[in-house]
């Protein structure tokens, strides 16, 4: 019984940490203190530019000239099979994380 309780508590702590990290992983220019000190503070980082270029190329292949939005913010509805439409890249139960 004691071992089961310890395992359940450990699982809950790990789940809470995962949701906290996911919630704070977005690029929030209004509150840069949420980011780690070693992270690149430039919003036009190579990773962001590469992601935008990939989405733009995908839209060109589909016949769309311009995407209506670059990505969906957190707490927005998303397509479960297309998590790349979320800014964070995570679509959990049809909501951007």
UniProtKB/Swiss-Prot annotation:
GO molecular-function terms, A-Z: ion channel regulator activity; toxin activity
Transmembrane segments: none
Keyword Secreted belongs to the record: yes
Propeptide residue interval(s): 23-68
Compartments where found: Secreted
Tissue spec: Expressed by the venom duct.
Signal peptide: 1-22
Sequence segments annotated as region (Disordered): 22-46
Keywords: Cleavage on pair of basic residues, Disulfide bond, Ion channel impairing toxin, Knottin, Neurotoxin, Secreted, Signal, Toxin
Keyword Disulfide bond: yes
GO CC annotation terms, alphabetical: extracellular region
SS bond partners: 71-87, 78-91, 86-96
Domain free text: The presence of a 'disulfide through disulfide knot' structurally defines this protein as a knottin. The cysteine framework is VI/VII (C-C-CC-C-C).
Family the entry assigns: Belongs to the conotoxin O1 superfamily.
Function in brief: Probable neurotoxin with unknown target. Possibly targets ion channels.
Name the record gives this protein: Conotoxin Cal6.1b
Species assigned in the record: Californiconus californicus
């Amino acid at each position: 019984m004691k071992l089961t309780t310890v395992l359940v508590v450990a699982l809950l702590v790990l789940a809470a940490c995962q949701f906290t990290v996911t919630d704070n992983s977005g690029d929030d220019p209004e509150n840069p203190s949420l980011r780690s000190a070693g992270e690149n503070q430039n919003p036009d980082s190579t990773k962001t530019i590469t992601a935008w270029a990939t989405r733009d190329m995908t839209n060109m292949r589909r016949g769309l000239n311009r995407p209506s939005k670059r990505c969906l913010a957190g707490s927005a509805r998303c397509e479960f099979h297309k998590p790349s439409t979320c800014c964070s890249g995570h679509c959990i139960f049809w909501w951007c994380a």
